[in-house]
A protein has these predicted regions:
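Residues lining hydrophobic/aromatic ligand-binding pockets adjacent to catalytic sites
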Residues: 1-109
Length: 109
């Protein structure tokens, strides 16, 4: 099953992730192909764009990346046999984090 968690919860302050679960860090600081570009992240954090524009730009970034599409297919496959956690450092404020967009995109594959 595809799941998500906030990085600080994963590090021992909340969500208990089973040892056997597959963990996918989707943070730019971890070099993830599933993270937003620095430009998109800066635009969002500086409030130069709204959530709808962020989602559209993020989807376009991901869909234009062969690496990201390949990783998403692998996540979808793994999630059929066990838990897969997408982990990011964004706070859960109103689900405004790209990991929720990714869950939706992967579910639609």
């Amino acid at each position: 099953m595809l799941k998500e968690t906030y990085y600080n919860q994963f590090k021992g302050w909340g969500t208990e992730i089973p040892e056997e679960a597959h963990k996918v860090f989707v943070m730019r600081s971890h070099g993830s192909f599933l993270a937003p570009s620095w430009e998109l992240l800066r635009d969002w954090q500086a409030e130069r764009i709204n959530w709808e524009e962020y989602k559209e730009r993020f989807r376009n970034e991901i869909l234009s990346s062969v690496e990201a599409r390949t990783i998403m297919k692998d996540i979808k496959k793994r999630s059929k046999d066990g838990d897969v956690y997408l982990i990011c450092s964004c706070h859960n404020k109103e689900n405004h984090c790209h990991r929720f967009i990714l869950i939706n995109m992967i579910s639609q594959l």
